């Protein structure tokens, strides 16, 4: 299991292609042709400037592509983090808008799949959807998931959050087949609700769980790694958790610590600096998934409990 970070320059993307469709890639594509496949997870500190964030994402995409990754995962709010109330709703766009157009072009020009967690998708004049978008290496949108569990929390230390005041929750659990296995899509606060991950694993047959996030510094220090490792262990899936990191503005700071975790709960990818911008790269080993699930067949041993 290899993991490392790299740093390179990027080239500017050009044209745009978009199509929304259900995945047509068979699950056996990745598991029978190649027993291992490389993935990357990005860490960044997004700000309230769409083009600045796109430049950072473009550079990280090129790093991942040159490292041989077939998929790179970005954190929640990759394209924008506002520093004033209402900013995120103001800049929200539909999936066929210019922001997503740029990222579709980037995926196609770089020949790599993108997991874009926490895109501000326009719902109406006062609300958005926190949408996880998966784009293939042809620049096509393969599927989307809208965050179901919204962050309405009083964080120890005085900060309060009310995501539901401007975000419409999703209602559908989503998985999508890809060259790196069957992906289970979630976003950030979903991590605290195991049932969605259980459904992705046991009902939708996910092999890799994606958790793009922007954990607060306080909650991240207390719970980030242990929650991620728990989700990996209880589902016997790889977990890729791309994280926002550091100070976005005077009011907001994210924990960072982007991680890739294997089905046994072992951290196999981690940046050396918890809050630095960069990527971590690791190999998804399908033989390990098979081995863990065969030796401990929890999918066959689960008992239905009605309370």
Swiss-Prot record:
GO terms for molecular function: [acetyl-CoA carboxylase]-phosphatase activity; deaminated glutathione amidase activity. GO terms for biological process: metabolite repair. Gene3D superfamilies: Carbon-nitrogen hydrolase (3.60.110.10). It comes from the Eukaryota. Its EC number is 3.5.1.128. Residues 1-36 form a transit peptide. Pfam families: CN_hydrolase. It is an enzyme of class 3 (hydrolase). One of its GO terms (cellular component) is plastid. Keywords: Chloroplast, Cytoplasm, Hydrolase, Plastid, Transit peptide. Residues 37-286 form the CN hydrolase domain. It catalyses: N-(4-oxoglutaryl)-L-cysteinylglycine + H2O = L-cysteinylglycine + 2-oxoglutarate; N-(4-carboxy-4-oxobutanoyl)-L-ethylglycylglycine + H2O = N-(2-aminobutanoyl)glycine + 2-oxoglutarate. Disruption phenotype: No visible phenotype under normal growth conditions, but the accumuluation of N-(4-oxoglutarate)-L-cysteinylglycine (deaminated glutathione) in mutant plants is up to 70-fold higher than in the wild type. The active site is at residues 76, 147, 188. The keyword Glycosyltransferase does not apply. InterPro entries: C-N_Hydrolase, C-N_Hydrolase_sf, Nit1/2_C-N_Hydrolase. Catalyzes the hydrolysis of the amide bond in N-(4-oxoglutarate)-L-cysteinylglycine (deaminated glutathione), a metabolite repair reaction to dispose of the harmful deaminated glutathione. Possesses amidase activity toward deaminated ophthalmate in vitro. Belongs to the nitrilase superfamily. NIT1/NIT2 family. This is Deaminated glutathione amidase, chloroplastic/cytosolic. The lineage of its organism: Eukaryota, Viridiplantae, Streptophyta, Embryophyta, Tracheophyta.
């Amino acid at each position: 299991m290899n993991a490392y970070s790299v740093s390179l320059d990027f080239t500017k993307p050009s044209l745009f292609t978009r199509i929304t469709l259900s995945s047509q890639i068979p699950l056996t594509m990745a598991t029978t042709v190649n027993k291992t496949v490389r993935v990357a997870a990005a860490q960044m500190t997004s700000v309230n400037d769409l083009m600045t964030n796109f430049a950072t994402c473009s550079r990280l995409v090129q790093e991942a592509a040159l490292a041989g990754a077939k998929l790179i995962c970005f954190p929640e709010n990759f394209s924008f983090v506002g520093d004033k109330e209402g900013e995120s709703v103001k800049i929200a766009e539909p999936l066929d808008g210019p922001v997503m157009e740029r990222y579709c072009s980037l995926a196609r020009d770089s020949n790599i799949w993108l997991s874009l967690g926490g895109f501000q998708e326009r719902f109406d004049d006062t609300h958005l959807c926190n949408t996880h978008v998966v784009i293939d290496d042809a620049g096509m949108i393969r599927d989307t998931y809208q965050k179901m569990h919204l962050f309405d929390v009083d964080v120890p230390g005085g900060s309060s959050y009310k995501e539901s005041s401007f975000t419409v929750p999703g209602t559908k659990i989503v998985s999508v087949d890809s060259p790196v296995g069957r992906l289970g899509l979630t976003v950030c606060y979903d991590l605290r609700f195991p049932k969605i991950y259980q459904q992705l694993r046991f009902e939708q047959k996910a092999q890799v769980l994606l958790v793009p996030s922007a954990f607060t510094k306080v909650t991240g220090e207390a719970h980030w790694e242990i929650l991620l490792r728990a989700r990996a262990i209880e589902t016997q899936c790889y977990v890729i958790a791309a994280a926002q990191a550091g100070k976005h503005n005077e009011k907001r700071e994210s924990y960072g610590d982007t991680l890739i975790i294997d089905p046994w709960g072992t951290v196999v990818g981690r940046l050396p600096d918890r809050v630095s911008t960069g990527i971590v790269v690791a190999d998804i080993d399908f033989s390990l998934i098979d081995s863990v699930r065969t030796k401990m067949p929890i999918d066959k041993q689960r008992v239905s409990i009605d309370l």
